[in-house]
Structure formats: structure tokens, C-alpha cells
């Protein structure tokens, strides 16, 4: 298992902190006028999702987290678990709702996601950056109803709600950015 020194810390690096796999979100080297230099990092615990800030003296080390990001296909939801499959090996994994978090609102069957495995157990699901979903319900956009140029809420086929422009109607396909939860454009099949 690799060990990382404080001068090797960078955003996205996966390390073990307090026997839990964590991902470094932000890393800052601080050299005060008096005293020893240190590195301040903001980390997300991959098991719980909690974000904490930690400080390490220069030269401290952390072991790497033995996690693997695997592309998997979303199969179905049986009410309790979401089931994913590795397309190459047909190996299946069941993921609970607390691991899936808000990624559930962007998933439809056959979508390919990145599932993070630790000790062969799923601990995080990352949906594709952009998904194409159908609008199941939205208010009709009336002509002249554009004061402020705003939008209107639309419910998608997965149950997610996003703001869309007034010209978009029920039944249309739209492209959504899953990182921000925002409408990007209309989409073709």
C-alpha cells in the first residue's frame, strides 16, 4: 500500500484517515512567519459523506485508500436496494439508499455510472455528468409570460425537479447537468 507525504497531497487523492477512506477536496500549504510549516486539507469521508478539515505537519504521511472506481450499469431498484452490474464480468452489486444519496434522482435503467468500491463493497455512486430525461409534468408556458425571463419547475421521469425555460413542454427530452441539477438544453433521442 502506498503512503503519501504532505507535499504529495492534491485534490481528488484518496487516503485513509482514522481507518476510513477519504477523498481530499481542498489542499493548502501554510508557512507561518513563526513556527513549523503545515498543510491544511479538507476531506470527505467516502463512507459517511461527512466533510472535515484536518491539519498535518510538514513531512507527515497518510496511507493510500485501497478504493477502485468501476464503471457499472444501473439495472433496477427493488424498493430497498439499487442493483448495478459490471458490463465486462456481469458481476452485480446491491447499493443501499444512503450510499446512493442524491444520485438516485438522476438514474434510469441501463445508465452507466461510476461506483467506488472499498473492500469490494460499494461506498459511493457517481452518476454521469449529463443525463437525458423526459419531462413528465410541467406548467404550460403562456405567451407573454416572460417577465424576468425566468423559468418554471418541471418534474422528470425519475422524480427529480429542475427549473426549465418557459418554451419546454411536457413529454420533451431535456439534457440535465447532474453535478448542479440544472437544465442544459433540449435533447433528441
UniProtKB/Swiss-Prot annotation:
Q: Which GO terms describe its cellular component?
A: cytoplasm
Q: Report the residues modified as N6-(3,6-diaminohexanoyl)-5-hydroxylysine.
A: 34
Q: How is it modified after translation?
A: May be beta-lysylated on the epsilon-amino group of Lys-34 by the combined action of EpmA and EpmB, and then hydroxylated on the C5 position of the same residue by EpmC (if this protein is present). Lysylation is critical for the stimulatory effect of EF-P on peptide-bond formation. The lysylation moiety may extend toward the peptidyltransferase center and stabilize the terminal 3-CCA end of the tRNA. Hydroxylation of the C5 position on Lys-34 may allow additional potential stabilizing hydrogen-bond interactions with the P-tRNA.
Q: Which GO terms describe its biological process?
A: peptide biosynthetic process
Recorded superkingdom: Bacteria
Q: Where found, per UniProt?
A: Cytoplasm
InterPro entries given in the database record = Elong-fact-P_C, NA-bd_OB-fold, Rib_uL2_dom2, Transl_elong_fac_P/YeiP, Transl_elong_KOW-like, Transl_elong_P/YeiP_cen, Transl_elong_P/YeiP_CS, Transl_elongation_fac_P
Gene Ontology MF annotations: translation elongation factor activity
> Sorted alphabetically, which keywords does the UniProt record give?
Cytoplasm, Elongation factor, Hydroxylation, Protein biosynthesis
- Keyword Protein biosynthesis appears in the UniProt entry: yes
Pathway annotation: Protein biosynthesis; polypeptide chain elongation
The keyword Ribonucleoprotein belongs to this UniProt entry's keyword annotation: no
Q: Name the NCBIfam families for this protein.
A: efp (TIGR00038), PRK00529.1 (NF001810)
Q: Which family does the similarity line name?
A: Belongs to the elongation factor P family.
The protein's job, in short, is: Involved in peptide bond synthesis. Alleviates ribosome stalling that occurs when 3 or more consecutive Pro residues or the sequence PPG is present in a protein, possibly by augmenting the peptidyl transferase activity of the ribosome. Modification of Lys-34 is required for alleviation.
Protein name, entry field: Elongation factor P
Gene name, Swiss-Prot/TrEMBL = efp
Amino acid at each position: 500500500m502506498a503512503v503519501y507525504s504532505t507535499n504529495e497531497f492534491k485534490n481528488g487523492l484518496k487516503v485513509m484517515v482514522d481507518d476510513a477512506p477519504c477523498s481530499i477536496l481542498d489542499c493548502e500549504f501554510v508557512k507561518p512567519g513563526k513556527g513549523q510549516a503545515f498543510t491544511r486539507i479538507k476531506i470527505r469521508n467516502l463512507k459517511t459523506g461527512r466533510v472535515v478539515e484536518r491539519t498535518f505537519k510538514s513531512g507527515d504521511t497518510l496511507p493510500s485508500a485501497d478504493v477502485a472506481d468501476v464503471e457499472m450499469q444501473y439495472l433496477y431498484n427493488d424498493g430497498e436496494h439499487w442493483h448495478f452490474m459490471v458490463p465486462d464480468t456481469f458481476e452485480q452489486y446491491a447499493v443501499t439508499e444512503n450510499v446512493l444519496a442524491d444520485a438516485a434522482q438522476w438514474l434510469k435503467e441501463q445508465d452507466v455510472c461510476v461506483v467506488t468500491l472499498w473492500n469490494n463493497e460499494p461506498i459511493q455512486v457517481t452518476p454521469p455528468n449529463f443525463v437525458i430525461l423526459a419531462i413528465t409534468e410541467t406548467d404550460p408556458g403562456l405567451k407573454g409570460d416572460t417577465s424576468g425571463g425566468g423559468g418554471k419547475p418541471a418534474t422528470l421521469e425519475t422524480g427529480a425537479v429542475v427549473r426549465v425555460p418557459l418554451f419546454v413542454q411536457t413529454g420533451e427530452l431535456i439534457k440535465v447537468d447532474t453535478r448542479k441539477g440544472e437544465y442544459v438544453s433540449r435533447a433528441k433521442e
